[in-house]
Amino acid sequence: MENFMVEMAKTISWIVVIGVLGLGIRVYGKVMAEQWRMRRKLTMQGVKGPPPSLFRGNVPEMQKIQSQIMSNSKHYSGDNIIAHDYTSSLFPYLDHWRKQYGRVYTYSTGVKQHLYMNHPELVKELNQANTLNLGKVSYVTKRLKSILGRGVITSNGPHWAHQRRIIAPEFFLDKVKGMVGLVVESAMPMLSKWEEMMKREGEMVCDIIVDEDLRAASADVISRACFGSSFSKGKEIFSKLRCLQKAITHNNILFSLNGFTDVVFGTKKHGNGKIDELERHIESLIWETVKERERECVGDHKKDLMQLILEGARSSCDGNLEDKTQSYKSFVVDNCKSIYFAGHETSAVAVSWCLMLLALNPSWQTRIRDEVFLHCKNGIPDADSISNLKTVTMVIQETLRLYPPAAFVSREALEDTKLGNLVVPKGVCIWTLIPTLHRDPEIWGADANEFNPERFSEGVSKACKHPQSFVPFGLGTRLCLGKNFGMMELKVLVSLIVSRFSFTLSPTYQHSPVFRMLVEPQHGVVIRVLRQ
């Protein structure tokens, strides 16, 4: 009898396993059929692309191209640094197919169909598309959930629109102008530190790795401007976010393939204990900060971004008490994570690249220095003088053209969507590779790979053949909320640094852009600084 029960249990187990596998294969087959249907819809409209394999799409070819590039990696120096088209090493398969199929093509990662779209007219259509049917790419946002949550950066539809209405007013231009002094205050400790480093060296010159100092300054700015606290309070949050950023990027969140398990069980978690632990720790730290803020501000009507988020969370949470509490907490923590990360990391990376480019072009340092001392008392920008810094603006715009922190504009068609004459089927993921768009000679001219801020002397509208092709802050309805704030912060930081120091690239600098959610210097930017 006992043996019979054991055999029966084994039989039932096998039946369950076979049933689950059968159901999974059936579901997977339906999804694969849907991907082929999407591809056929695109090819019937003249969109070509590399032929995919049955189950893995173009992933094997992507891996092969990537490995070939890694084995042939080069080091760049001098003028070759600026001219170096790093997209050919960071995303070589996209570059390879662009040369083969043109500015618009389709490819597959197995269970997802993608549309590469770098044609200026289609980018313009994407920019003008005022619809909630183009959202952020769902499988990417799921894999970024640990660092960005379901905040305003990653959410879609009415949930995104509601969050944007709450947060946007804090970044209107009139408010941003009032934050110039705050950025100056946050930058001063960094400048003093660099001066002290030079004194300790006992020399007039000193090699400085600028990246972490810029991150600290930018983190202090976002902490004080948006959350009413200094960087010292949020230091651990920023440190953990940086660790989480590196851990997530190591998992290749953009183009990895989970295939069968993704389809049957949903996009699986990263399966990384370190990521899980970091996520829990960050959320705990942010929630502690929020509760401390609530205790301190009882009866206070201070209207910074933190207060707007708290009020928005209260107004948007429905359901029973337990559900409301969890919904309130998720709303607040997710948006704080998004703003903590995007608000400081992008600015710090942009200034790092700007200093690298200025180190190679000392004549532009001189022009900035002259302009700052002409318009800013004691070389310190304020709300009135910052709008007069035209040269600084040109240099920053050229930096964002050559080294935009964000590599992609990405969208997923949540419904069939018409862009110009092209109908994008529901479920297709759209990718616009910003650095390639920014270096296209047909758009920017023969000097597209050169550092020439003069091209922006009459503004973005006259800088290139298709002004809508300048998209460092994204485009359309999903344009970066912090664009005005970010530009102001960049102007202040660059003005303060260049007015106090002249610099060249250190011989120890290794030019190696890397993609870690943003395009950043892998080994940091090392400049050889001379006190003015």
Curated annotation (Swiss-Prot):
A Gene Ontology term for the protein's cellular component: endoplasmic reticulum membrane
Keywords, alphabetical: Endoplasmic reticulum, Heme, Iron, Membrane, Metal-binding, Monooxygenase, Oxidoreductase, Signal-anchor, Transmembrane, Transmembrane helix
Membrane topology: Single-pass type III membrane protein
Primary location class: endoplasmic reticulum
Transmembrane segments: 5-25
Family: Belongs to the cytochrome P450 family.
Function as written in the Swiss-Prot or TrEMBL entry: Involved in the inactivation of early gibberellin (GA) intermediates.
Something else known: Overexpression of CYP714A1 causes severe dwarfism with defective leaf development.
Protein name in UniProt: Cytochrome P450 714A1
Protein source organism: Arabidopsis thaliana
